[in-house]
Regions:
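Short, flexible, solvent-exposed loop/turn segments with mixed acidic/basic and small polar residues
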Residues: 5-7, 153-156
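Membrane helix-loop-helix hairpins that form the core translocation module of multi-pass transporters
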Residues: 113-123
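Beta-strand scaffold of nucleotide-dependent catalytic cores
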Residues: 118, 155, 209
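Active-site glycine-rich loop that binds ribose-phosphate moieties when present
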Residues: 124-153
């Protein structure tokens, strides 16, 4: 079977995008995501994002995200910008687009060529929102977490999907392939967790690496960047109401915490290529 696709990336967080607006999501999507995401052997990506017909009145489309291991995710900040860019270049040429996701409806505004700003909605540091267990009810903004014999100070933030944020002295020296899986599968997070390791440069500049559940280390994570800035704002490190620049391996995202604990994220959305895969 031949499968048309578009490969896109936001800060090098790359996905394979499928137009499922009429056909629906393929029945074998989990296996497809595992197969097509393999780097060096297939297209290679962090997963597949299906662009579907909207389910909410007034929305322009819906996205469903499937990680490289075939599991379905709730939300991807980099991915939703790319969905907006794809819709914009495929006949929905509106400066502001509305996209349904598994964590609610998101509004995305075009800020320039291949540049979009997403209204991510609110965040929560309460245990039930992640979920997290054996850590108290929350807010979980400065908690001890023992991982393979070492105790880390973490903040646990939900932005529609669960994140565990920890501050380190030197993010580049970390061996994420060793410690990332232990965080992801920690028993305190029954649905697994995404983990952000952040180095504070100053109050409005951060360096970050991320271990995503279901995908491993990725070069960027929009929701993870939002969770990181939210956590450091709660801790008094970053200022609310100001742009915070976060440098990831794949580029820069700009996050702002608004009144009411709402989040804005601004970043790129770039088409890499289009093609047809034999599946």
């Amino acid at each position: 079977m031949k499968l048309s696709f578009t490969k896109m990336q936001g800060c090098a967080n790359d996905y394979i995008y499928l137009d499922c607006r009429e056909s629906g999501v393929p029945e074998n999507i989990a296996a497809l995501s595992q197969d097509l995401s393999r780097r060096h052997f297939s297209i290679g990506a962090d997963g597949i994002i299906c662009i579907c017909a909207p389910v909410t009145a007034g929305a322009d489309g819906r996205m469903r995200i499937f990680n490289a291991d075939g599991s379905e995710a709730q939300m991807c900040g980099n991915g939703v910008r790319c969905v907006a860019e794809w819709l914009y270049t495929h006949g929905v040429a509106k400066e502001t687009l509305v996209v349904d996701t598994n964590s609610g409806t998101k509004t995305i505004t075009r800020k320039g060529r291949q540049l979009w700003q997403v209204e991510m909605g609110g965040y929560s540091a309460m245990a039930a929102a992640l979920p997290a267990v054996n850590m108290g009810e929350g807010p979980l903004v400065d908690c001890p977490l023992t991982v393979e014999g070492r105790t880390w100070r973490v903040a646990c933030i939900s932005v529609g999907n669960p994140h565990c944020v920890t501050v380190v002295d030197d993010v580049d020296s970390l061996k994420l392939e060793d410690i990332g899986p232990a965080f992801e599968k920690h028993p305190n997070f029954p649905e697994r967790v995404n983990t952000e390791f952040v180095q504070v440069v100053d109050s409005t500049h951060l360096k970050m690496r991320v271990w995503e559940r279901g995908s491993g280390e990725t070069w960027a994570c929009g929701t993870g960047t939002c969770a990181t800035v939210a956590a450091l704002t709660e801790l008094g490190v970053c200022p609310a109401g100001e742009d915070v620049h976060v440098q990831l391996r794949g580029g820069e995202l700009i996050i702002r915490v608004l009144p009411g604990k709402k989040l804005l994220v601004t970043g790129s959305a770039v088409t890499v290529c289009e093609g047809i895969a034999e599946v």
